[in-house]
């Protein structure tokens, strides 16, 4: 772990609570976790997204990523609301299909959020630029395509500091245990 990661910051965030509990003589437990995002380790890892302005004057989101309960539709709608001047009511998420939606590779919640989310963000940039000075009616039938390829190094790469995954998330949790009952008293 180097200084580009957020692990130290998560530890520093719980430190005041830890110090207080120790000062009070309370038993304390700390757990740290790290989660990678993406397929990684040099395996091809891409996300693709297509935005189409359809006859209803709404942007329809298409991505060939399997949604198996991880909430990809919600993520792509949020990405579109955040990265365009559109309101939620102007956006339609279309479930994945092989007829029109571009392939977005393997599926997992963190992978699709990062990789296909970035592809969606890129498509949103193109859409927003095209919308400048125009109306949704002017853009009916236009398609805006975004793609993101997460470049990583294979396992055993002969290079200093190989990149196994494009992103990581870090967390630290601390619990204070009740001395008498042995049960968790509080969780930070």
For the regions a language model picked out, list residue spans one by one.
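Short acidic capping loops at alpha-helix termini that bridge into adjacent secondary structure
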Residues: 87-92
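Cofactor-centric catalytic regions
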Residues: 1-84, 96-188
């Amino acid at each position: 772990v180097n200084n580009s990661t957020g692990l130290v910051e998560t530890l520093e965030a719980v430190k005041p609570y830890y110090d207080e509990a120790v000062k009070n003589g309370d038993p304390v437990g700390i757990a740290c976790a790290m989660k990678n995002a993406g397929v990684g380790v040099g395996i091809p890892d891409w996300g693709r997204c297509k935005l189409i302005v359809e006859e209803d004057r709404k942007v329809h989101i298409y991505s060939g990523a399997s949604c198996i309960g991880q909430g990809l539709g919600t993520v792509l709608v949020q990405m579109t609301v955040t990265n365009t001047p559109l309101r939620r009511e102007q956006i339609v998420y279309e479930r994945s299909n092989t007829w029109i939606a571009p392939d977005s590779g393997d599926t997992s919640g963190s992978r699709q959020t990062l990789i296909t989310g970035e592809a969606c963000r890129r498509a949103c940039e193109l859409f927003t630029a095209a919308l400048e000075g125009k109306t949704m009616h002017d853009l009916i039938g236009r398609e805006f395509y975004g793609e993101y390829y997460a470049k990583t190094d294979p396992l055993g790469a002969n290079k200093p500091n190989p990149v196994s995954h494009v992103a990581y998330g870090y967390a630290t949790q601390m619990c204070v245990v009740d001395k008498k009952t042995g049960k968790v008293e509080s969780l930070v």
